[in-house]
Amino acid sequence: MQEQEIGLLSKYNEGLCINTDPNSILMSILDMSLHRQMGSDRDLQSSASSVSLPSVKKAPKKRRISIGSLFRRKKENKRKSRELNGGVDGIASIESIHSEMCTDKNSIFSTNTSSDNGLTSISKQIGDFIECPLCLLRHSKDRFPEIMTCHHRSCVDCLRQYLRIEISESRVNISCPECTERFNPHDIRLILSDDVLMEKYEEFMLRRWLVADPDCRWCPAPDCGYAVIAFGCASCPKLTCGREGCGTEFCYHCKQIWHPNQTCDAARQERAQSLRLRTIRSSSISYSQESGAAADDIKPCPRCAAYIIKMNDGSCNHMTCAVCGCEFCWLCMKEISDLHYLSPSGCTFWGKKPWSRKKKILWQLGTLVGAPVGIALIAGIAIPAMIIGIPVYVGRKIHNRYEGKDVSKHKRNLAIAGGVTLSVIVSPVVAAVTVGIGVPIMLAYVYGVVPISLCRSGGCGVSAGNGKGVRIEFDDENDINVGGTNTAVDTTSVAEARHNPSIGEGSVGGLTGSLSASGSHMDRIGAIRDNLSETASTMALAGASITGSLSGSAMVNCFNRLEVQADVQKERYSLSGESGTVSLGTVSDNASTKAMAGSILNSYIPLDKEGNSMEVQVDIESKPSKFRHNSGSSSVDDGSAARSHPGGLSGGLPEGKSSATKWSKEATAGKKSKSGKLRKKSNMKINETREDMDAQLLEQQSTNSSEFEAPSLSDSMPSVADSHSSHFSEFSCSDLESMKTSCSHGSTDYHARFATVNILPEVENDRLENSPHQCSISVLTKTASCSEDPQLNHIAEEHSNNGIRPNVDLYFGNALKETNNNHSHQTMELKVAIQTDI
């Protein structure tokens, strides 16, 4: 029995030794721990990464057995068997091995738990960082401020930079970078932490709110920035700035400096004129294509007048003001709607300039003529398209709806057939209703909205003339004044005309200039007339002098020619090379002219109330009438008149009554229409010495009337010496008849028949700069013979003209006298027309 137990124990121990080898057990435990770590690492990576990788099954590890290990194992087996022979000692050794195995497992488990705790702490630290959607960098959570209006989060650095850019560009409606929700001002203050930027932000918000208030008026003083909210100040428009140290008075209506005793239009015209004078007198200012392009790229907002720069990058013309949010068109500078570019306004969505008036009129006429054909064509295409298209559309929709469903084929076909049949019945009705409603709407738009909108905006080109009926104007494509910029364009055009004037095209440069004419070699009367053009081109000439020929068109037969030289620098105007000077001053609305010493002409541009230039024509006609002058003055030297040679203009005057009478009638009609504007100031009598002097001159001219010599303007001009200036009133019919009676009796004291003349104050010691800017030109010339006693009828005629450049045309037509023994003496006629087209 004992031997059998020992044998069994030995077999059991051998089995235990094989199964409970400490090295193998330790290796297995280590393998288990490694597998566990790898599994935890894999789980960590899978939790951290958003993309899960496919699990790879690890191949089983193969153990290599060496020859030494086999012999060592045999020796250990023998030793263990010997120890087991001791009975109890063998069992104790087995228990010790189990205890050691347990301690090893606990140590391995403790190391695994410590490593797991470290990994969890690292994962917690990684989870505290968030990626910014703007800069794409990872930051901690405390660098992501919370926004009240939305849930999006961005880092504080990106938000601060974003707010700085928005505020510096005066955008106050700042939205979230990731959505359209607006920031709360409290959030902006917390993010910025900058008092200067917050002051700008609040100021821009205040300005944006005040711009929307129609009663808000900003102080026009420079660097003031004070606003006055005035309620009910239309009747009392004088406002005062309330800022300390300013106190500027300005107008409620025009929002400019207060202008006492002036309307807003008059003050605006005066400001524009002064600005124009300063711009033109400064010789250092030059205009080029670059400067013009730059001016076109900067325009004020039509609502808040904030200047806006548009980049020339081919962008559209739909602009939005960043200050007030006004949506306007860059071409017409008017607030617009979504249908602005579809209306006949002439503004294009992508173009750089609007249509010209010619294109608008052609488009309008084409629309009016082609509208019936186009509408009929559209209706003819729409009706069959709707009748056929609606059933096809309905059938396809029903088929797509039943496709993919568990429905019988018979039921689906029945539904499709029913829907198509119903649509075939309904589609003609729908087509008829659509055409019946759409065609009248299109006709009403074409024949109602289009003409009214074009004529209301001035694009139809139809205007009523001065008693001449309706006139259709076609302008050039390049001469388009876009709305709101007329003043600026006019100023630039005048300034450009100053540098490159051309009399041949009927233009005189600048606001100040002078003309000098030489008449010493006038052999024939010129019948050449320079063409007048409203869009006269400028031509660059050498130096500052301009030469041109100005002649009259009184007769077809040419007997004389007058050459005129315009010199801007000298500012002189003489009508005779030998003697006799005529001084032409400026004439304003109140008909005040200044007599100048010498031969000086100050040629200001006359403007009417709307800022347009004036056209002045002076016709001098010899006819028995009184000397009364309409808004003119003459200053002729006595000595120069006395030294003139005997051959005057009355020396050889052929008959030219047809053309001269025509000019005189037109001038008389113009004079009568303007006679209501003159004002009489005072009356005075002509002294006897002046009458005697004029009588002697007339006798001297009448004695040489049969000679045909080179005429001179100085011979026919009486002396008004000592810087006197006579301001004559218009002719009256009663005085004209009485004058004819006195002339028929051969009376030489016709100067005593003068009724009244107006005294001009301050005719001396006046300078060119003090002359008024609104002027007309008038010349007093007296040419008569003693036998016929003709008088010169001076008629000044003013016409409004929209031309930009001043044009000066001087026409001298001399009617030569013919004597016939079988007929009575005919009255000679002298026609002189000075036309200024500006």
UniProtKB/Swiss-Prot annotation:
Zinc finger annotations (RING-type) as residue ranges: 132-179, 301-332
Signal peptide (residue range): none
Residues that coordinate or bind Zn(2+) 2: 150, 152, 176, 179
GO molecular function: ubiquitin conjugating enzyme binding; ubiquitin protein ligase activity; zinc ion binding
Region annotated Interaction with CASR, chain positions: 660-838
Binding positions for Zn(2+) 6 per the UniProt entry: 329, 332, 340, 347
Transmembrane segments annotated in the record for this chain: 368-388, 424-444
Keyword annotations from UniProtKB, A to Z: Cytoplasm, Cytoskeleton, Membrane, Metal-binding, Phosphoprotein, Repeat, Transferase, Transmembrane, Transmembrane helix, Ubl conjugation pathway, Zinc, Zinc-finger
UniProt GO BP: protein ubiquitination; ubiquitin-dependent protein catabolic process
Amino acids binding Zn(2+) 4: 251, 254, 259, 264
Reaction equations catalysed: [E2 ubiquitin-conjugating enzyme]-S-ubiquitinyl-L-cysteine + [acceptor protein]-L-lysine = [E2 ubiquitin-conjugating enzyme]-L-cysteine + [acceptor protein]-N(6)-ubiquitinyl-L-lysine
Binding site for Zn(2+) 1: 132, 135, 155, 158
Recorded topology in the membrane: Multi-pass membrane protein
Role: E3 ubiquitin-protein ligase which accepts ubiquitin from E2 ubiquitin-conjugating enzymes UBE2L3 and UBE2L6 in the form of a thioester and then directly transfers the ubiquitin to targeted substrates, such as SNCAIP or CASR.
Subunit structure: Interacts with UBE2L3 and UBE2L6. Also interacts with transcription factor Sp1. Interacts with SNCAIP, CASR and VCP.
Protein's recorded name: E3 ubiquitin-protein ligase RNF19A
Organism per entry: Sus scrofa
Gene name for this UniProt entry: RNF19A
